């Protein structure tokens, strides 16, 4: 039976990427060696790292604009701490938008290092919307936001305007839509949504913003050290970086971010259309802030829930259960999710 994987992450990856990756685990580059047993400093893997870095900057339209791409470890969760370590000055202040669980966690970590001003929060309505009316302080070192909220199904459609540094956690929607990525001074994203398997974390940073905090930074948390060592200060996550390279090449061959955005819009509009037109379902997030990556919805007649769950199971649908803090259902429709799988879900909703 064909499976339809709506998991929030780790999540679906392109089938051709999985095939290439599995072959490389057995015999990488016709070396008669596995990808996961070669030296990370071999010419073959150095070429992988360089190609992956170049693909990131090309797909985000950040080539020759002063940015570099890093592949680190510790997930986006470690970036919650690395970001203030590298950007928050001694006795400085940063501003944060609180739009969900992950932004709340980033705030908690940043407060360990300095004065953090939470300038707006949607916690009053269980994070089901994106705050819009807030004032950005002038005396901050940076402003931090989270572009997409996997748990609650909200997504920022526009971003704050500030004369200070702008930082964005794009873990769950990077490479999914066309935006001006140059408005950000630092972007970070865990790989396990639109890039590859868990194990590496992408950081895209403007190099000239670093080294200005006046604080001592542990080596493993210092972006400048990782830049100087080409993301190899310690042994990199060889397999996740390689799969990320394959996924980004797949995206480039597809036509890049502009092409995948059209596909993503079609998938989301198909599913949201059914949610809005079917009285048995209702969306969990404010309509104007709905995520095109994580579609959260509720069933309005609980007497039909067990039947719907069984229908999904019989159809090979996986990973549809909503997060415990929201309940209901969450269909994660990342870049690699085919629209045919979304149609299978919509057909079930219509037949309930």
Model-assigned labels for residue ranges:
Residues 77-143:
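PLP-dependent aminotransferase-like
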Residues 14, 191-272, 286:
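Active-site C-terminal subdomain of aminotransferase-like
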Residues 167, 180-192:
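Conserved active-site segment immediately N-terminal to the catalytic lysine
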Residues 2-53:
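A glycine-/small-polar-enriched, mobile loop at the entrance of the PLP active site in fold-type I
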Residues 281-311:
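Conserved PLP-binding catalytic core of the aspartate aminotransferase-like
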Residues 9, 110, 121-174:
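Active-site phosphate-binding strand-loop segment of PLP-dependent enzymes
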Residues 32-79, 86, 101, 109:
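Conserved N-terminal alpha-helix of the aminotransferase class I/II PLP-enzyme fold
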Residues 330-352:
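PLP-dependent enzyme catalytic core of the Aspartate aminotransferase-like
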């Amino acid at each position: 039976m064909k499976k339809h994987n709506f998991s929030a992450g780790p999540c679906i990856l392109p089938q051709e990427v999985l095939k290439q990756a599995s072959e490389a685990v057995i015999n990488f580059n016709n070396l008669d060696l596995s990808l996961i047993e070669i030296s990370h400093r071999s010419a073959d893997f150095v070429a992988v790292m360089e190609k992956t870095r170049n693909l990131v900057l090309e797909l985000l339209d950040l080539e020759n604009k002063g940015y570099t791409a890093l592949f680190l470890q510790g997930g986006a969760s470690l970036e919650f701490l690395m970001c203030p370590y590298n950007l928050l000055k001694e006795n400085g202040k940063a501003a944060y938008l609180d739009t969900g669980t992950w932004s709340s966690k980033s705030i908690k970590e940043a407060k360990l290092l300095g004065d953090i001003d939470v300038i707006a929060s949607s916690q009053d309505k269980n994070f089901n919307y994106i705050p819009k009316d807030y004032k950005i302080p002038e005396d901050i070192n940076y402003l931090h936001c989270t572009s997409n909220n996997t748990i609650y199904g909200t997504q920022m459609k526009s971003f704050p305007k500030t004369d200070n540094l702008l930082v964005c956690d794009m873990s769950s929607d990077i490479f999914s839509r066309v935006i001006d990525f140059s408005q950000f001074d630092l972007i970070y994203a865990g790989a396990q949504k639109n890039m590859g398997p868990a194990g590496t974390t992408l950081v895209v940073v403007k190099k000239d913003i670093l080294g200005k905090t006046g604080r001592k930074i542990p080596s493993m948390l210092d972006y400048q050290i990782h830049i100087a060592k080409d993301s190899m200060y310690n042994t990199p996550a060889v397999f996740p970086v390689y799969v990320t390279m394959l996924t980004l090449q797949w995206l480039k061959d597809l036509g890049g971010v502009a092409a995948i955005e059209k596909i993503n819009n079609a998938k989301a509009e198909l599913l949201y259309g059914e949610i809005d037109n079917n009285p048995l379902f209702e969306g969990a997030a404010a309509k104007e802030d709905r995520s095109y990556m994580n579609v959260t919805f509720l069933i309005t007649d609980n007497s039909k829930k067990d039947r719907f769950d069984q229908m999904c199971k019989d159809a090979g649908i996986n990973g549809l259960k909503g997060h415990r803090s929201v309940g209901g259902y969450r269909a994660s429709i990342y870049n690699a999710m085919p629209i045919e799988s979304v149609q299978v879900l919509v057909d079930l909703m219509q037949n309930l």
